[in-house]
A protein has these predicted regions:
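Conserved active-site regions of diverse hydrolases
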Residues: 1-370
Length: 370
């Protein structure tokens, strides 16, 4: 499995390049408090994994939005030079890793791309940009144009890999950005009809981010269908991360499965926003610090990091990464590409053992795959 992606997949490559962040209590350069999903997938399946992901990478090349100020443009350009794009990761792989830029075992190697979130959340710190971006989705500075550009580029990345010989390809959609702790942390977004009530502002931000996520996922699904028809001999899997995160939240899916069945204690970090007839329950982040803060202060880490859903404002915990690996692995197994994974109860016990060992300093020396 050859992977291209961003901080949701980065296994320490950005920190290896910068030698700076993320600092502890981030785990060995990961944007989480423990291993990230490709590492769990390797442990549970024995599948060979080659990971090219860099934290901060975007799906498309940075492009200034109309009306964006100098600070916003400089921020996007800076992020591009530090983290690059998925296209640069693929070009580097084709030029430096392969002989003559050709994939020799395209039928026994899968190529996975997971990106897009940075194309959108990079706008969040910028007050004017994020407001126009979300409030005017149809406008030239609105999110629909950015989604179209990101999804178009993701399709081009698949075509590049196919042209080099890849035949088994995996795309992943996005979890609901409107349910991440970034909604609780944000101070920059201003609704169209300004409310003095900050709760109403956050509810509107959550709604807009959820709309953006659904639009991205719909456009990506359409793009994947077109690619399947366009690329003869290809097998393309679309992993529905959005639906899977809904299950982890206890929304939809199997009504007999609740978050605690996955090992979560969501009540501990739950925050319910209520305004007039609107209500939404979100999860607070477990770690209240920043990438470059680095502190041994236990007070800024939640008391149950092994049972939390989100580590920081946008990144999942080690436990959530473990379940994301289970989702990806099961989709690969259903396609007949790898052997079946263990049943959910067995896998849960394995996940919890590893996560507790990493996050709580368990004394166990080894953890065998289930």
């Amino acid at each position: 499995l050859v992977i291209f992606g961003d901080s949701l997949t980065d296994t320490g490559r950005l920190k290896e390049r910068l030698k700076i962040f993320p600092l502890a209590p981030y785990w060995i350069g990961r944007f989480s408090n423990g291993p990230v999903w490709p590492e769990y997938l390797f442990m549970v399946t024995g599948l060979g994994v080659q990971n090219h992901a860099y934290g901060g990478a975007s799906a498309a090349d940075p492009e200034a939005l109309p009306g964006e100020n100098f600070y916003g443009r400089a921020r996007h350009v800076g992020q591009f030079f530090v983290s690059g794009t998925i296209g640069l990761q693929i070009s580097d792989y084709l030029e430096r890793t392969l002989k003559d830029g050709k994939i020799e075992r395209g039928d026994t190697t899968a190529f996975l791309i997971w990106a897009g979130a940075n194309d959108y959340i990079s706008k969040e710190p910028l007050r004017g940009t994020i407001t126009t971006f979300l409030n005017s989705p149809e406008g030239e500075a609105g999110y629909k144009a950015v989604v179209e550009r990101a999804v178009t580029q993701l399709g081009q990345h698949v075509r590049s890999l196919y042209a080099a010989g890849a035949r088994r390809l995996v795309m992943m959609n996005l979890p609901d950005l409107g349910r991440t702790p970034i909604v609780l942390q944000n101070t920059t977004y201003v609704p169209e009809h300004l409310e003095s009530n900050d709760t109403a502002r956050r509810l509107e931000l959550a709604r807009r981010l959820s709309e953006l996520t659904r639009y991205h996922n719909q456009r990506l699904a359409t793009a994947v269908e077109k690619l399947r028809a366009e690329l003869p001999g290809s097998e393309i899997i679309l992993v529905d991360v959005y639906e899977y995160f809904e299950r982890l939240y206890g929304i939809g899916g199997n009504p007999l499965l609740q978050p605690e069945d996955f090992g979560y204690d969501l009540a501990a970090l739950a925050v319910t926003l209520s305004f007039e007839e609107q209500q939404l329950t979100l999860q607070r982040r477990c770690y209240d610090g920043s990438y470059d803060q680095g502190t041994p202060d236990p007070d800024i880490v939640c008391p149950n990091p092994d049972q939390a859903l989100f580590w920081d404002s946008v990144h999942p915990t080690a436990l959530t990464h473990c379940w994301n690996a289970y989702k990806v692995g099961n989709d690969l197994a259903e396609a007949g590409w790898i052997r079946p994974l263990p049943d959910q109860r067995t896998y849960r016990g394995w996940c919890q053992t590893i996560v507790k060992r990493v996050t709580l300093g368990s004394a166990e020396d080894t953890v065998s795959a289930p």
